C-alpha cells in the first residue's frame, strides 16, 4: 500500500495501517495534535484503517476540517453533560458549525446559571478522559435501540435512512450517540471550550415541528485561541445589526405581524432611499431602462418559467388549484415579468442588448427557523435587472455586470470583504435542473474563463446553481462568520426558449437571445444589515440618517442654532438642533451615541462671528469654521460618497 502525503512524499506499507498509526510514523508531535485524517479529500476518523493506495492528509485543529471534528466531539460532550444533569432531556442533533457547535434538546429552556453548571459537568467528563469508540448497527437494530432509550428524534433520523443502511454510532464511556463522524480518539482532546448561549429552534427548522432548546458553544485547541475568539464575539455582539439596528431605530419586528417581516423605521428608510436613488441613477448611466411590474401573477406564469415545478415550496401561493378557478402566487423574482415587457414589442438584432432594471419587492417562503433580523426575511427589496442580449454580446455584458457589482462594493467600502463563487449545477442530480449537460458545461466554462481573465479569485460550488443556469455569487460573512450571498449574476441560455423570446437577425430570421439575471447591489435589507455591522452603525456621511447635529451651549443661542439648521437644510443636509436644557458634555455624548458624524457647537463667539465650532467623529475637535466653508466640505463629502477614516478614539474627543 502506497500512501501519498500532503507534501507529495510517499510512504509504503506491507499491511493495512490506521490513520493514527501513520500519523505517529510521520511524527509523534503531529500524531498528538491530530484530530482526524483526510483520505482522498474526505475527512475520516484517526481510527480508520487504510488498506489500499490513497492520498492522506493528517488534520489538526489548525485545519478547518480538523477544527470541525474537535467541535463535533465537543457537542457530544455537551449532550452527555446535559443528559447527566437532566435525565429527561431528549437529544436531537448536534453538529459543528462555522463558529463552534450546537446541540438541540427537547427540554425546558436553560438559564445562564444552567449553562455554567453544564460547563462544569463537561469538564468532569473531559477529565475522566473516556476513549471514543465507533460501532455500527443495522437500521432495524438502531431503531430498536433508540426506542428502548426513548429517544424519538433519533428514531426519526434513523427511519429516514434507507433500508439495509449500516448505521454508525459513537460512544464515550457509558454515553452513546447516533453519528456519521468523524470524532476525536478521546474526549481529552476537547481542551478549550465555552458554552455561549441558549435559544429556541424548531426540529428540522420547520415551525410545524416541536420547539427545541438549542445550546450554542465553541471550542478551540488552546485557551489562547478561545480567548481571542471570545473577544471577537464581544465585538460581534457590539456590531450585530439585529441589536444595533433596533437601538438606532433603523428597523423593528412585531410578533403579530410575523417573522421575517421587519418594519423599516424612518432612519432605515432614509438609508434605503439613498441607496436606491444612487443605484437607479448609476444603472441609468449604464444604459438601463426601468420597469414596474406586478407583485403577483397567476400560477400559469410560473409553470412556463419552471418555478412552479422547481421552486413552488419557496413561494407564497394564493388559492388552491383543486378548488379555485385562478391560483396566484406572490413573486419570488422579477424575471418572467420583464420577459413579457420584452415580448410586448418586436426587436431586431440592432436593439440588443436591452437592459431592464427594477427596484423590486419580492416574497420568499422561508422557514421560521431561518429568519434573522434583516438578513433572512420573507419580504425584501432588491435591485434586480435582466439583460436580453445576442449570444455574441453575452461575455461583454456579463463582464459589465461584474464591473457594476464591483463598483457598488467599492463605493460602499466593502470590496475587500467579499468572496466570489462560481455556482454550478450538480450533474448527479439532474432532476433539479432544466437543459442538457453540454449547455451547462459550456456556460460554466464561459463564466470560469471570464473570472480568470478578470483576475478574480473564486471557488467552484457544485449544486448551487439556479435550476436554469450557472451564476457568480458574491458572498460576505456577517459578524458571526455566517456567509450570505449579497450579489448574484447569472448566465441563462434556456429560459428564452421557455418564453418564446426572439429577435430578428440581419437576415430577417428569428433567433433566441441569451439572458443575464443580475443584481447590482443585491437585497437592500441584507445590504443594510451588512453596512450596520461593517461600520458599527457609523455609516459614511452620505448614508447617515442624521448628518449634522447643532448643539447650542445654552438657551439664549437657540435662535442662532435655528438659523444654522435652516441653512444646512436649504443645502440638503439632514440635521437637527439639540435644544434640551442639559449639560454640554451630556449632549455631546448623546450625539456620539446616536452616531452623528458632525456636531456644530454654537455659543456667543460663534454667533458674533457668524461661525460654527466643528466636532467630528473623524478628527474630534476640528476648530471654528465659516458655516459656508463647512457646508462646502460636507456637500463635497456627500457628493463623492467619501469614506473618512476615524483617526481618534471616542474617549479622546
Give short role names for the model-derived ranges.
Residues 1-90, 97-653:
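NTP/phosphate- and nucleic-acid-binding module
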